Amino acid sequence: FNPENRRRMQGLGEKEDTTLSSGKSLPFVVTISREYGSGGHHIGELLAQRLGVKFYDRELITLTAQQSGLGECTVQENEQTVNGRLLYDDPVQTAVFRAQSRVILDIAGRESCVIVGRLANFILKGRPRCLHVFVYADEAARLKRIISEYGIENNRAEALLKRTDQERREHCLHYAGCDWGDRYYYHLMLDSSMATDEQVAEAIYSVIHCLAAE
């Protein structure tokens, strides 16, 4: 972990204000962090459809490439990961992270939306009118989804699951200085193995609906 990254992260967003209902003029943004294979992408899509707002996941790769001047392949290879346990930043990965942070801040400033991954909850930490969600599931359910829905071979699924989660965890630690799955950094954490994706999305929608009524 590079301590300088935490200082930079703290300077990205607005002043600390964890009140969800404050800042009424701001767009409402939902960030979804997720364990690999938990269905966070699909749940985010369903939620965005239910809310009638834009959904951002892989689209952020294109937008980050445009912001940074790097190719989309370079962005895809260097986002949400770090090269081992580095004490110092990889210049390309840092350029990608900074460009992606600017993209996320710009999106959050102009439209209500659902954003999946990319440390959006940390980039928007303290910003009013954000709901930060973490989606997880038991390993058996995640492996089943990875194999049946993502088309990953059985003998590769477990290793891919562990590697992807570890990459996300190390990326979060390196750039935010925080534990990726720590409940302190989320308003809502949901076990997707306990319900269908549609039910999980509806549960998040219900929370947002209650907040809007306050």
Where is each model-derived feature located?
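ATP-dependent small-molecule kinase phosphotransfer cores
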Residues: 59, 64-112
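Conserved phosphate-donor/acceptor-positioning beta-strand/loop module used by diverse small-molecule
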Residues: 126-149, 154-164
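Short, amphipathic alpha-helical "lid/cap" segments that border enzyme active or binding sites
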Residues: 101, 197-205
